[in-house]
From Swiss-Prot:
Main function: Nitrate reductase is a key enzyme involved in the first step of nitrate assimilation in plants, fungi and bacteria.
The family this protein is said to belong to: Belongs to the nitrate reductase family.
Reaction(s) the record says it catalyses: nitrite + NAD(+) + H2O = nitrate + NADH + H(+)
Subunit structure: Homodimer.
Gene Ontology biological-process annotations: nitrate assimilation; nitric oxide biosynthetic process; sulfur compound metabolic process
Name recorded for this polypeptide: Nitrate reductase [NADH] 2
Cofactor: FAD; heme; Mo-molybdopterin
Taxonomic source organism: Phaseolus vulgaris (Kidney bean)
EC number from the UniProt entry: 1.7.1.1
Residues annotated as binding heme: H548, H571
SMART domains, A to Z: Cyt-b5
Cofactor note: Binds 1 FAD.
Keywords annotated in UniProt: Disulfide bond, FAD, Flavoprotein, Heme, Iron, Metal-binding, Molybdenum, NAD, Nitrate assimilation, Oxidoreductase
């Protein structure tokens, strides 16, 4: 009979913290019920005491979930989380792994608050009583089940299973060459006891059709509204045979470690497909659809693939590699990791430590139910291997399948460690699969399972004794550290300075490179000295301030800080190469200190040896209290979407509420803001200019043209940020940063451009497409001041008349302020009766509708680069404008 874990209400104490989840979690019946063998003849006779003991151990030590301040102002601010989790994609969405040593401390079953999390967007708020799962498609009896019906009417299975993100250990790949995925460390795996309804029972109840009638695939769809592919649900599919195979233990899970699912893990119901990658286990399950074709969700095709190493993003799109079925990932591959020694651990070498062996430990797993049969460790680069002791706490199912990780250990003589440069591990499973020696790069950074290598180095002598320091390949997320990072920095240094030679005794960087602390970099945050940190390198950007295309603010807003994530989000490869000209040194990430000032990281007791300073997780700066101005150049501010109005088929007016209703945005006229969002696991930042007046209190408006996918042949994927904004629901939070820009209109013809004053009586204003918004902002400020007599002459280009933004406002200004404001439209194609220009911006149009060049005229423009380069600049020069000094480009 299926095991039970004790009667309980769903609103429960969860590991010491009351978890109400902001919803009603109470079912209409207790979860405990026994099933006779006749009603569960396809199920295992689970050992109830075995499962109870697993759950008891998992919950024996408190791992609290709390309201993390880092979630304040996001759509997930109601979700309780463990503060120790290492965040991999900034504040939101929540993608995180446990610190590796904390994960290993709990052993076989992972406490829920420490279970890794992969979210593509906000966590849906769910109610047990209202939630339904629809079964539809190629079934005889389409049905919508409530949660109570699923629990009451079907037998349940309960068993432990290890979940692994396909991106586990991805950061190692990113250190070789950047993939399109974020930096998972080696703790993107966890194990829980799951309880749920076998999916095959539900499909049989609904009368799933045969293969001959087209029922070839079973698709699972979640509740989230996500931006991928122009807006879609998270969905994926498996074959009909897999779904109906009793040996695979595929369930619709509603309990984890004896409790209802946590919000981050899919409350109230999710898929569990043991032995598969986590990406196939849809959370917040809403629909199961039996189909003839694979799932059509964007995330089924554009995620969880291992493409050949030569395929880059452009080739993948051009040649349709995403849609080739042979590259999809389903079952996990064989993998293993060294967890002891931990990163930066110090093993002192003395008469006591050398008398006993050091125990190297780690975990291993495989997919498809294949048992890990052997783990081996080498101390000499693979010349010889030592077979490890295996610990399999799991009982196989009645088909002999193993769904969980195992643990391995090996006793090594300390003197052998002293003589080696690295420890490496590989595992084998019962299919005789093993791990490759070298990393195999792929575009998505998936399924990395090369030998896991820990480097060893001898510490500097202290009081006549020495020690061994161990170094893992990487640290998760944007945390610094790891031998791969140091070797990469060394290679880059050698490329920049060929005279430097790599040390033959250590992978550490050449000591000739100048090192700076974070506190030292922080001091350089002004126009007189602007330093930044990117990927552990320190750059002095002071001399580039005046040349930066985005103006000095773009650098000063991040001066004195580590801006790696933001730099990568908005800069091209060309810009990244240019940055190398400004590198002055490296960031100090570890250092040797006295034992009195640093905790002992060794698992072998106290010592008087030098210890490496631990790498502490960077904590988020607490939000500033409400004040008169919302924008803070040093901080992202969370703003709530309060309204969204459709102006046309692809134009939306978004209104965002500021953190305090009595705040001004604080955006000078002429400057812009960055919208920041994590999309498909990567930070995306785009510059926008609000159309609302700078004097508005409590909110700001953005007029956005949504660039949908499959509309423009040159941009088949459409606009990343605009489609993300389109997908946002009312109440969603968005991070805003600024002000940015090198142009500021200070009133009555006066401008500040890169810190220098300029004046004009007449403005030649040229805009293309959405580039009208900064022009509009300046014009709005001028016309609000009756004593500002600056003349504005606008030429505004678009593809069609329907694409003209803010036309009603522009025409009203031209009518009511005809002496100060004039506008001329140019469209590529026109309808009959069109009274303005047709084609492109030409010299003739500009001479007719713009002021002549003079000492009191300035030109300003914003639009597509080709328009500025091939129309605006050459024609202004023909008109006598000094485009170097008299043309302002937003």
């Amino acid at each position: 009979m299926a095991a039970s874990v004790g009667n309980r209400q769903f609103a429960t104490h969860m590991n010491g913290v009351v978890r109400s989840c902001g919803q009603d979690l109470k079912p209409s019946l207790p979860l405990d019920f026994d099933l006779d063998s006749s009603s569960s003849d396809d199920d295992e006779n689970d050992d109830a005491s075995y499962l109870k003991e697993l759950v008891r151990k998992a919950n024996a030590e408190t791992e609290a979930s709390v309201m993390d301040p880092r979630d304040e102002g996001t759509a997930d601010q109601w979700v309780a989380r463990n503060a120790s989790m290492v965040r991999l994609t900034g504040k939101h969405p929540f993608n995180a792994e446990s610190p590796l040593q904390r994960l290993m401390h709990h052993g076989f079953i992972t406490p829920v608050p420490l279970h890794y999390v992969r979210n593509h967007g906000p966590v849906p708020k769910a109610n047990w009583e209202d939630w339904t799962v629809e079964i539809t498609g190629l079934v005889k009896r389409p049905t919508r089940f409530t949660m109570d019906r699923l629990v009451r009417e079907f037998p349940h299975r309960e068993f432990p299973a290890t979940l692994v993100c396909a991106g586990n250990r991805r950061k190692e790949q990113n250190m070789v060459k950047k993939t399109i995925g974020f930096n998972w460390g080696s703790a993107g795996t966890s194990t829980s006891v799951w309880r749920g309804v076998p999916v095959r029972h539900v499909l049989r109840r609904c009368g799933i059709l045969t293969r001959g009638k087209g029922a070839l695939h079973v698709s699972f769809e979640g509740a989230e509204n996500l931006p991928g592919g122009g807006g879609s649900k998270y969905g994926t599919s498996i074959s009909r045979e897999m779904a109906m195979d009793p040996s695979r233990d595929i369930i619709l899970a509603y309990m984890q470690n004896g409790e209802p699912l946590a919000p981050d893990h899919g409350f109230p119901i999710r898929m569990i497909i043991p032995g598969f990658i986590g990406g196939r286990m849809v959370k917040w399950l809403k629909r199961i659809v039996v189909t003839e074709q694979e799932c059509e969700s964007h995330y089924h095709y554009k995620d969880n693939r291992v493409l050949p190493s030569h395929v880059d993003p452009e080739l993948a799109n051009e040649e349709g590699w995403w849609f080739k079925p042979e590259y999809i990932i389903n079952e996990l591959n064989i993998n293993s990791v060294i967890t002891t020694p931990c990163h930066d651990e110090i093993l002192p070498i003395n008469s006591w430590t050398t008398q006993r062996p050091y125990v190297v430990r780690g975990y291993a797993y495989s997919g498809g139910g294949r048992k890990v049969t052997r783990v081996e460790v080498t101390l000499d680069g693979g010349e010889t291997w030592h077979v490890c002791t295996l610990d399999h706490p799991e009982k196989p199912n009645k088909y002999g399948k193993y769904w969980c990780w195992c643990f391995w250990s090996l006793e090594v003589e300390v003197l052998d460690l002293l003589g080696t440069k690295e420890i490496a591990v590989r595992a084998w499973d019962e299919g005789l699969n093993t791990q490759p020696e070298n990393l195999i790069w792929n575009l998505m950074g998936m399924m990395n399972n090369c030998w896991f290598r820990v480097k060893t180095n001898v510490c500097k002598p202290h009081k006549g004794e020495i020690g061994i320091v161990f170094e893992h390949p990487t640290q998760p997320g944007n945390q610094p550290g790891g031998w791969m990072a140091k070797e990469k920095h060394l290679e880059q240094s050698q490329e920049a300075k060929p005279s430097l030679k790599k040390s033959v005794s250590t992978p550490f960087m050449n000591t000739a490179s100048k090192m700076f602390s974070v506190s030292e970099v922080k001091k350089h945050s002004s126009p007189d000295s602007a330093w930044i940190i990117v990927h552990g390198h320190v750059y002095d950007c002071t001399r580039f301030l005046k040349d930066h295309p985005g103006g000095t603010d773009s650098i000063l807003i991040n001066a004195g800080t580590d801006c790696t994530e933001e730099f990568d989000a908005i800069h091209s490869d060309k810009a990244k190469k240019m940055l190398e000209d400004y590198r002055i040194g490296e960031l100090i990430t570890t250092g040797y200190t006295s034992a009195d000032s640093s905790p002992n990281n060794s698992v072998h007791g106290n010592s008087e040896f030098i210890h490496l300073a631990p790498i502490n997780e960077i904590t988020t700066i607490p939000p500033l209290p409400p004040r008169s101005v919302a924008l803070n150049p040093r901080q992202k501010i969370p703003c709530k979407l309060v309204s969204k109005t459709s102006i046309s088929h692809d134009v939306r007016l978004f209104r965002f509420e500021m953190p305090s209703k009595n705040q001004l945005l604080g955006l000078p006229v002429g400057k812009h803001i960055f919208l920041c969002a994590t999309i498909d696991g990567k930070l995306c930042m785009r510059a926008y200019t609000p159309t609302s007046s700078v004097e508005e209190v409590g909110f700001f408006d953005l007029l956005i043209k949504v660039y949908f996918k499959d509309v423009h042949p040159k941009f088949p994927n459409g606009g990343l940020m605009s489609q993300y904004l389109e997908s946002l629901s009312i109440g969603s939070m968005l991070d805003v940063k600024g002000p940015l820009g090198h142009i500021e209109y200070t009133g009555r013809g006066n401008f500040t451009v890169n810190g220098k004053s300029r004046f004009a009586k007449r403005l030649a204003m040229l805009a293309g497409g959405t580039g009208i918004t900064p022009i509009y902002q300046v014009a709005q400020a001028i016309l609000k001041d009756p004593e500002d007599l600056t003349e504005m002459h606008v030429v505004y280009a678009n593809r069609t008349e329907d694409d003209i933004l803010l036309r009603e406002e522009l025409d009203t200004w031209a009518k009511e302020h005809c002496e100060r404001f004039k506008v001329w439209y140019v469209v590529e194609t026109a309808k009959e009766g069109w009274g303005y220009g047709v084609g492109f911006i030409t010299e003739a149009i500009m001479r007719e509708h713009l002021p002549e060049a003079s000492s009191d005229s300035l030109a300003m423009t914003c639009g597509p680069p080709p328009m500025i380069q091939f129309a605006v600049q050459p024609n202004l020069e023909k008109m006598g404008y000094d485009i170097k000094n008299d043309l302002l480009v937003f």
